[in-house]
């Protein structure tokens, strides 16, 4: 009996104190930021990589984006069949990664609009894909449409029926006065009228991206990311153009002044072409939220056998099979991301994660370049 007990205890001891593989030098040691150093936000963000959980994923995302921004063709050896221009060291140094930025409309409703405007203003991204709300919400907030009110902070728990009686629309904990859309109609309908005239007189065939570019020109407002996209010749694609207030405007306009044509086929050629003809550049994807912008950017990059960098920031899960929640590895299976790509998904509200990521990547890089001038 005593021998049996001894064997049981020995077995339990062996189970409890199983010998470990030595991880020293193989894995990052978990440690957080020491505030005894003082408050240094850059070092705080850098510490996220060793913090664990989603802080580490955000730290990894910062690293991936910095790789994306630092890459140049000079990092690669010239291929045998490249052109003479591509052999020139100065040319190779000038060739940078093409950055695709995708985001859902709620982020333009939020203060992330100003972060996105900063990136577009300074031409830090090359291609944008968003939803219809990501177009109209930017225009509605434009200061040049002086009669329009801003979006306001509310509460997630405000009763829908009560808000409806007051003409207030809720987006999470944001409130948008319905008058905004009434005044948006007053602003946009004359522009659609003019576009129809030009379609007839100048034989212009409008596409969603051309329409969006025109609206960016018309808003003429430095607080608008669409204004800067127009000014910097950055294409903004919106394949679901009719799914929002802008679609409502097109619907009502089709009765008041029928005939305007918006061709989506030209735009699918254009957005896919942005990826297909990116070579010899690498491509990187930064996608906030899921749905249409996420898939549209990934699918375009499939046409070139996958993007080289990918950062997804969203709170969706993969277990219902939705594309929104799919991790980068699923996109690799479709050829939308290269098998050798640097990728990460940050499971986090983009209103928290994205400004922090921009602070330690795009903005930090620009500030460093500005100080070195």
From Swiss-Prot:
<feature type="binding site">
    <location>
        <begin position="330"/>
        <end position="336"/>
    </location>
    <ligand>
        <name>spermidine</name>
    </ligand>
</feature>
<feature type="binding site">
    <location>
        <begin position="105"/>
        <end position="109"/>
    </location>
    <ligand>
        <name>NAD(+)</name>
    </ligand>
</feature>
<dbReference type="Pfam" id="PF01916">
    <property type="entry name" value="DS"/>
</dbReference>
<feature type="binding site">
    <location>
        <position position="248"/>
    </location>
    <ligand>
        <name>spermidine</name>
    </ligand>
</feature>
<comment type="pathway">
    <text>Protein modification; eIF5A hypusination.</text>
</comment>
<comment type="function">
    <text>Catalyzes the NAD-dependent oxidative cleavage of spermidine and the subsequent transfer of the butylamine moiety of spermidine to the epsilon-amino group of a specific lysine residue of the eIF-5A precursor protein to form the intermediate deoxyhypusine residue. Also able to produce homospermidine from putrescine.</text>
</comment>
<dbReference type="GO" id="GO:0005737">
    <property type="term" value="C:cytoplasm"/>
</dbReference>
<dbReference type="InterPro" id="IPR029035">
    <property type="entry name" value="DHS-like_NAD/FAD-binding_dom"/>
</dbReference>
<feature type="binding site">
    <location>
        <begin position="349"/>
        <end position="350"/>
    </location>
    <ligand>
        <name>NAD(+)</name>
    </ligand>
</feature>
<feature type="binding site">
    <location>
        <position position="137"/>
    </location>
    <ligand>
        <name>NAD(+)</name>
    </ligand>
</feature>
<comment type="similarity">
    <text>Belongs to the deoxyhypusine synthase family.</text>
</comment>
<dbReference type="InterPro" id="IPR002773">
    <property type="entry name" value="Deoxyhypusine_synthase"/>
</dbReference>
<keyword id="KW-0808">Transferase</keyword>
<dbReference type="InterPro" id="IPR036982">
    <property type="entry name" value="Deoxyhypusine_synthase_sf"/>
</dbReference>
<feature type="binding site">
    <location>
        <position position="295"/>
    </location>
    <ligand>
        <name>spermidine</name>
    </ligand>
</feature>
<feature type="binding site">
    <location>
        <begin position="131"/>
        <end position="133"/>
    </location>
    <ligand>
        <name>NAD(+)</name>
    </ligand>
</feature>
<feature type="binding site">
    <location>
        <begin position="136"/>
        <end position="137"/>
    </location>
    <ligand>
        <name>spermidine</name>
    </ligand>
</feature>
<feature type="binding site">
    <location>
        <begin position="315"/>
        <end position="316"/>
    </location>
    <ligand>
        <name>NAD(+)</name>
    </ligand>
</feature>
<dbReference type="GO" id="GO:0034038">
    <property type="term" value="F:deoxyhypusine synthase activity"/>
</dbReference>
<protein>
    <recommendedName>
        <fullName>Deoxyhypusine synthase</fullName>
        <ecNumber>2.5.1.46</ecNumber>
    </recommendedName>
</protein>
<feature type="active site" description="Nucleophile">
    <location>
        <position position="336"/>
    </location>
</feature>
<keyword id="KW-0386">Hypusine biosynthesis</keyword>
<feature type="binding site">
    <location>
        <position position="290"/>
    </location>
    <ligand>
        <name>NAD(+)</name>
    </ligand>
</feature>
<keyword id="KW-0520">NAD</keyword>
<feature type="binding site">
    <location>
        <position position="243"/>
    </location>
    <ligand>
        <name>NAD(+)</name>
    </ligand>
</feature>
<feature type="binding site">
    <location>
        <begin position="321"/>
        <end position="323"/>
    </location>
    <ligand>
        <name>spermidine</name>
    </ligand>
</feature>
